[in-house]
């Protein structure tokens, strides 16, 4: 059994999917890219990131760009700018769509769980 980090009761997982371009290897495996955030809902900080691409280096780099970001305080514009300026993979636009979708789910969750 793999070791799993204890994120605590305030951490919630938000994921969104978007269609990948047809000309990249990940499309043959997944068809879509998933972008998932583990967000501490008390602080708004992204504690971990999941991206369903093939290359571990790519997944690790995208996580590096996003982990620690306060999505509650700062929104997603900075995340999108980082991906736009520092990630030049063919899946860039799909990842940005996934970020927007995961953020929308976070906002929806916050509205449903006020109080």
Where are these regions (language model features)?
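Short, compositionally biased leader-like segments
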Residues: 1-17
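Active-site- and interface-proximal helix/loop "cap" or "latch" segments in soluble metabolic
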Residues: 19-36, 41-115
């Amino acid at each position: 059994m793999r070791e799993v980090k204890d994120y605590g009761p305030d951490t919630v997982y938000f994921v969104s999917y978007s269609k990948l371009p047809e000309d990249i290897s990940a499309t043959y495996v997944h068809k879509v890219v998933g972008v998932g955030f583990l967000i501490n809902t008390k602080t708004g900080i992204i504690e971990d990131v999941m991206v369903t691409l093939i290359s571990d280096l790519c997944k690790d780099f995208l996580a590096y760009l996003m982990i620690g970001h306060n999505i509650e305080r700062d929104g997603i514009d900075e995340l999108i700018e980082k991906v736009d300026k520092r990630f030049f993979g063919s899946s860039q636009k799909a990842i940005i769509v996934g970020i927007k979708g995961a953020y929308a789910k976070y906002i929806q969750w916050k509205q449903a769980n006020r109080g």
